[in-house]
From Swiss-Prot:
Source organism per UniProt: Zymomonas mobilis subsp. mobilis (strain ATCC 31821 / ZM4 / CP4)
Family recorded in the similarity comment: Belongs to the elongation factor P family.
One of the Pfam families matching this protein, by short name: Elong-fact-P_C
Gene Ontology molecular function: translation elongation factor activity
Protein name: Elongation factor P
Amino acid sequence: MKISGVDIRPGNILEYEGGLWRAAKIQHTQPGKGGAYMQVEMKNLIDGRKTNVRFRSAETVERVRLDTKDFQYLFADGDMLTFMDKETYEQISLPKDLLGDAVAFLQDGMDVVMELYEEKPISVQLPEQVEAEIVEADAVVKGQTASSSYKPAILDNGVRVMVPPHITAGTRIIVDVNTQEYVKRAD
C-alpha cells in the first residue's frame, strides 16, 4: 500500500530501494523556505543497517504489512535456533544474529512472535519482560543509601544489569528484554 512520505509513523515497515526497512524515528520538518518533509531514521530488517532519509510530502513509499505467527523456542544448535510453529508443529531454524542482543534472554519453551514477509522470517519478537535469576551481585557500599543507587549484578544468562541494593544472589527478577534493565522483583 502506497503512503505519502509525511504519513510514515515509527514502526512502519517500508519497502525502500529494494529492501525492507522499519521506521525507527521520525521528525516532521517545515522549513520557512521550501516544502515540508519527514526525516526518517530507518533500520534494515535483513542486515541491520541504519539510514536517514528525507521524504517530501509529494513522495510516496510502499508500506509493507508483515504476517505474524506464534512460535515456540525449542533449542539452540551451534549458531542456529530452532522454533516450532504452534499451529502446524513445523520446525524452523534461524541464525542467532536475527535476534541480536535479545538472544541471551531466550528460554526453552518460550513463546515468541515471528514476523514473516512472503512466508520468510524477518524478525523474532520475545516477550517484553522475562524472569531471570541473579547469580552474582556486588555488595552494597555503605553510605550510598541517601539517593537511589543501583549496583551491578550478573544474571543466569550472563547478562549484566543494574539492580537495587536489596537484591542479592539467588533472587529472581523481571528484566526488560529491549533495554536489558531491572524492572521488579519476581513474585
